[in-house]
């Protein structure tokens, strides 16, 4: 990643467009005006228009006189940053070599080159550059962190620890230093130490977004370690509302709704914070725990403080639908759509409320409208919902099959890779599998199942189950898949079949596994019937009743 980037602007902003028009006019008058090329490249770069920025940077470098070293350094540095943003570190290194040759004492470019060498696995060269930074600034925390990262790669953990401690000692009031040390500690396998550093960073700077993001990222793979670390921080500072809120937020994100609700209530009852928006969190938890009346009261409190919050109106619609108040649910979803026209989630919820009132044609139309603006998981879900209505209620099996096929195609691994090409890389490799509900590939097994491709569907489900599953969410999706597979075979055979029985057994295996991992969404377990993914076919089996009783403590 590049060391620094300009503040992002809006390329469609009238002022930005006016500036670009001026640059275009200047270049039409003098096609070799390198300063204008460089200035326009900077504007494009600041707006993520990397191909255009690269073209202008190339032209600037081509026309800059050799004697103008200062401008050449600026242009080479910009082009190096463009290469780094587009994941071309080898090309970036060539430009950075040139900038350092022109100015060996440029702290920024030496640091950029050190990081680029590290990315390319050139640890000896990276070490040389980090040591050069220390000569330029003996208190350089960037250099110390960089040397620590190299030491970790070379398995010199004692040396790495010393560099990290030196970095913190040199700037103990800088929250970012703790975040950097946390990243390195995480790479060392020291998750507890990493969480401790993140909490120190937040104690130093409560608004540090990097610290919060890293904590959330870590929870996706090291949930227990993160919760333990936050809990230790709360024990040391029990009245810091932010720490309690963070724990609640992470617990909620990982389907531990009962624990999250307890923390939210602690903030409310102990008056740790008067933020009314917290009632949206309690409402979400109560909805997931099947406490629908209390959830409605809480979401109404949240809306009293922020009546134009569309997301809260969507949640209110979901709660009302769970209560059987279908007309009121439709009104709430319509209000959300009025506040946020063409919003995919609002359109889907409006479609589901229409479906609950047996207005199947209207539901299909709303799901179709949602597909026109949706992306990723929302798009896959909207297509699946539309296909389900067409297949089960509107006698349009051919159209339904086409939509199921479309979902299978847009969730194929290569399609997913192409869809993200050019996007900025995630902070960690685990980010790609971080948020289950945001991954459209989760619907791929069901889409393939409805396409009649059972072997491919099973393989897609196996790929999901091979991913880390800290909270049981993947296992629950597997239970949904095999429950629906069992239902499909029962429909085909007009009764029980050997394959259907096997699928039911497999579904219960994964349901038990999900609950063993603490999956605590009672709404999806007991009440949810929304297509395409639910466990409704399991609920009449005695094994379901037994599991529900055994894991009642989760709810």
Sequence positions of predicted segments:
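Position-specific recognition of the canonical hydrophobic site in helix A of tetratricopeptide repeat
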Residues: 45, 84, 111, 118, ...
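Alpha-helical protein-protein interaction modules
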Residues: 186, 192-195, 209, 213-215, ...
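Structural marker of alpha-solenoid helical repeat scaffolds
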Residues: 29, 63-67, 102, 136, ...
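Canonical positions in the second alpha-helix
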Residues: 25-26, 59-60, 98-99, 132-133, ...
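Single-residue signature of alpha-solenoid repeat helices
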Residues: 19, 53, 92, 126, ...
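Residue-level detector of the short coil/turn that links helix A to helix B
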Residues: 14, 48, 87, 121, ...
């Amino acid at each position: 990643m590049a060391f620094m980037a300009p503040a992002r602007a809006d390329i469609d902003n009238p002022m930005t467009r006016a500036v670009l028009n001026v640059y275009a006019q200047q270049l039409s008058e003098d096609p070799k005006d390198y300063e204008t090329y460089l200035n326009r490249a900077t504007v494009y770069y600041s707006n993520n228009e990397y191909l255009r920025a690269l073209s202008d940077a190339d032209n600037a470098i081509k026309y800059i006189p050799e004697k103008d070293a200062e401008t050449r350094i600026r242009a080479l540095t910009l082009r190096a940053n463009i290469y780094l943003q587009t994941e071309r570190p080898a090309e970036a290194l060539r430009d950075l070599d040139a900038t350092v040759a022109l100015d060996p004492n440029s702290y920024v470019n030496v640091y950029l080159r050190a990081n680029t060498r590290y990315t390319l696995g050139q640890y000896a060269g990276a070490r040389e550059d980090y040591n050069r930074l220390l000569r330029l600034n003996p208190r350089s925390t960037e250099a110390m962190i960089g040397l620590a990262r190299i030491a970790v790669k070379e398995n010199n953990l004692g040396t790495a620890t010393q560099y990290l401690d030196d970095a913190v000692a040199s700037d103990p009031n800088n929250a970012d230093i703790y975040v950097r040390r946390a990243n390195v500690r995480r790479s060392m396998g020291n998750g507890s130490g990493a969480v401790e550093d993140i909490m120190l960073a937040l104690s130093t700077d409560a608004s540090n977004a990097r610290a919060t993001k890293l904590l959330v990222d870590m929870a996706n793979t090291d949930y227990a370690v993160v919760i333990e670390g936050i809990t230790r921080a709360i024990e040391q500072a029990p009245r810091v509302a932010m720490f309690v809120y963070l724990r609640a937020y992470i617990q909620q994100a990982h389907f531990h709704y009962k624990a999250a609700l307890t923390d939210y209530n602690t903030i409310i009852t102990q008056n740790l914070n008067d933020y009314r928006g917290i009632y949206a969190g309690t409402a979400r938890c109560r909805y997931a725990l099947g406490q629908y009346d209390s959830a409605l009261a809480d979401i109404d409190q949240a809306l009293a403080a922020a009546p134009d919050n569309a997301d809260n109106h969507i949640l209110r619609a979901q709660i009302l639908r769970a209560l059987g108040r279908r007309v009121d649910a439709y009104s709430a979803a319509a209000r959300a759509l009025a506040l946020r026209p063409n919003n995919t989630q609002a359109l889907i919820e409006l479609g589901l409320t229409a479906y609950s009132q047996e207005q199947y044609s209207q539901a299909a139309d709303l799901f179709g409208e949602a597909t026109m603006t949706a992306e990723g998981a929302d798009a896959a879900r909207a297509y699946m919902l539309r296909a389900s209505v067409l297949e089960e209620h509107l006698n349009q099996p051919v159209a339904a099959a086409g939509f199921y096929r479309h979902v299978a195609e847009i969730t194929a691994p290569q399609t997913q890779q192409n869809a993200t090409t050019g996007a900025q890389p995630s902070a960690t490799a685990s980010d790609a599998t971080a948020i289950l509900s945001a991954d459209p590939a989760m619907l791929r097994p069901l889409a393939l199942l409805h396409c009649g491709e059972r072997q491919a569907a099973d393989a897609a489900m196996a790929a999901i189950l091979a991913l880390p599953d800290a909270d049981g969410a993947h296992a629950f999706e597997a239970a949904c898949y095999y429950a629906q597979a069992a239902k499909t075979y029962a429909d085909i055979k007009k009764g029980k079949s050997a394959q259907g029985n096997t699928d039911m057994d497999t579904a219960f295996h994964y349901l038990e596994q999900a609950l063993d991992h603490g999956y605590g969404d009672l709404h999806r377990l007991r009440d949810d019937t929304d297509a395409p993914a639910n466990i409704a076919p399991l609920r009449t089996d005695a094994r379901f009743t037994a599991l529900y009783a055994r894991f009642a403590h989760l709810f």
